[in-house]
């Protein structure tokens, strides 16, 4: 079984750790091995939160830069911050209005690394 590397990021209070727990429990329920790590220093004050989730035959809990298969960003700015974690051909899901991402200066990086991205206005959907 291969390893699937997932980075989840956002700001304190957005539910990054909760979303990580849901994905981890779902994977375990399906019989997959799960390893993870999280960083949430100033999260209580709206600071950056990042969670590493590795499914399958992972050696260690941290995901190296350029090796994540998926990046799930609950905040647009955090998507830019953690974009270097994505592998070439990785998939990026961002909580932002469609058409508002990416910034032009980042578009070239996304295109050259064949990153597939999808914008979902998740906050707006949740509030409606």
Predicted regions and their residues:
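Active-site cofactor/cluster-binding pocket
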Residues: 1-128
């Amino acid at each position: 079984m291969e390893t699937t590397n997932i980075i989840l990021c956002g700001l304190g209070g957005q539910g990054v750790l909760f979303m990580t727990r849901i994905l981890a429990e779902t994977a375990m329920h399906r019989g997959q091995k799960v390893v993870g790590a999280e960083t949430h220093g100033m999260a209580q004050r709206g600071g950056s939160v990042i969670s590493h989730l590795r499914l399958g035959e992972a050696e260690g809990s941290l995901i190296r830069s350029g090796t994540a298969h998926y990046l799930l960003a609950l905040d647009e700015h955090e998507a830019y911050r953690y974009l270097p974690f994505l592998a070439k051909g990785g998939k990026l899901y961002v909580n932002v209005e469609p058409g508002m991402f990416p910034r032009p200066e980042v578009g070239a990086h996304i295109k050259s690394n064949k990153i597939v991205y999808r914008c979902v206005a998740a906050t707006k959907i949740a509030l409606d």
